[in-house]
Amino acid sequence: MKKIVLAYSGGLDTSVILKWLQENYNCEVVVFTADIGQEDDMSVIQKKAAALNVKEIFIEDLKEEFVRDFVFPMFRANTIYEGYYLLGTSIARPLIAKRQIEIAHLTGADAVAHGATGKGNDQVRFEFGYYCCDPNIKVIAPWRQWELTSRHSLIEYARKNNINVPLDKVNEPPYSIDANLLHISYEGKSLEDPYVEPDYTMLSRSLTPELASSIPEYIEITFEQGDPIAINDISLSPANLLHQLNKIGGKHGIGIVDIVENRYIGIKSRGIYETPGGTILLHAHRAIESITLDRESAHLKDEIMPKYAKLIYNGYWWTTERKMLQSLIDKSQEKVNGTVRIKLYKGSVIVVGRKSNNSLYSYNLASFDSESQGYDHKDAEGFIKVNSLRLKKS
């Protein structure tokens, strides 16, 4: 191998991997860090890489691209995996993989490497992304190759090589954490027992509902063709809008979930997720769709959503079938315009109003107090008779 591009977070795992690659492949290692809203100090990450004698360091602000081209398209589908998971980690991997391959081409590297473990989904997501973008790229997955088979052995290797081991608030190695502008996830340690209540002091973006404000807050979100464009009539870029919703939702205890999910490779995994802004967006988007989509379009979207979510979760973002579904979803959003009013209170997102110039809602048809033109109550009798025929024969 001539040169390797490593997806580098600056954390314990990828710092150890960087050292291990240098020792075992005897070639130049380029590091790439995607700033997608994880709120790490990028200058510290650069110094860590430089201290390990890395000559080419790419640290790129991809927050706007991440939200505009990945998060928002996913939210047009009201995407949710297994009833709870808003796919915060899953949706970040295609962008990182794409840019990693682009940097490999730019620097003349013939291989890429990642820090995903051999038990997780991310190894699949990264490598599917690599091969979609460059079928001939060589892939190095250290967790499937080296003899460091546990967190303990990883920490020992780090200490022997003078690599800093971060500690949490109680002076222990922290949870396995993944963060971006959409969410923060926590795995490992005591969470591996699914019956143990989490220590919520781990949370960094949200207050728990018990500690959240006792005063409800009302906000309005404006949508244009299915994408949010403004909060309280203030237009914001995609990344800034999601960042602002995270701040608002976090102080009201919105979007904290405790999940046991089914990984693609067949293992069940427990995690704690903070997704305040995304949780608000999901409720708001469904609300604006409720008055702008006709019944059959809305029901069709609900039918295909689990398939779409599964494709993203399993790493198939760049595939033809995902793009086909995206085209259908995007077509449905052409008239999803308007404003949703929401009340936030102690972990709850309560839709209290919605309006749109494209609304299909008719007050005269819906009201119990008005006579509707074009609808006669007696018409329902024939409708019921025809649709009950098969029931009478069963």
UniProtKB/Swiss-Prot annotation:
Binding site for ATP: A7, Y8, S9, G10, G11, L12, D13, T14, S15, A34, G115
Protein residues bound to L-citrulline: Y85, S90, N121, R125, S176, S185, E261, Y273
UniProt keyword terms in alphabetical order: Amino-acid biosynthesis, Arginine biosynthesis, ATP-binding, Cytoplasm, Ligase, Nucleotide-binding
Domain of life: Bacteria
Catalyzed reactions per annotation: L-citrulline + L-aspartate + ATP = 2-(N(omega)-L-arginino)succinate + AMP + diphosphate + H(+)
UniProt: L-aspartate binding residues: T117, N121, D122
Pathway listed: Amino-acid biosynthesis; L-arginine biosynthesis; L-arginine from L-ornithine and carbamoyl phosphate: step 2/3
EC id: 6.3.4.5
CDD domains on file: ASS
InterPro entries in UniProt: Arginosuc_syn_C, Arginosuc_syn_N, Arginosuc_synth, Arginosuc_synth_CS, Arginosuc_synth_type_1_subfam, AS_cat/multimer_dom_body, Rossmann-like_a/b/a_fold
GO MF annotations, alphabetized: argininosuccinate synthase activity; ATP binding
Enzyme class at the top of the EC tree: ligase
GO-annotated cellular components: cytoplasm
The family this protein is said to belong to: Belongs to the argininosuccinate synthase family. Type 1 subfamily.
Subunit architecture: Homotetramer.
Annotated protein name in UniProt: Argininosuccinate synthase
Organism: Ehrlichia ruminantium (strain Welgevonden)
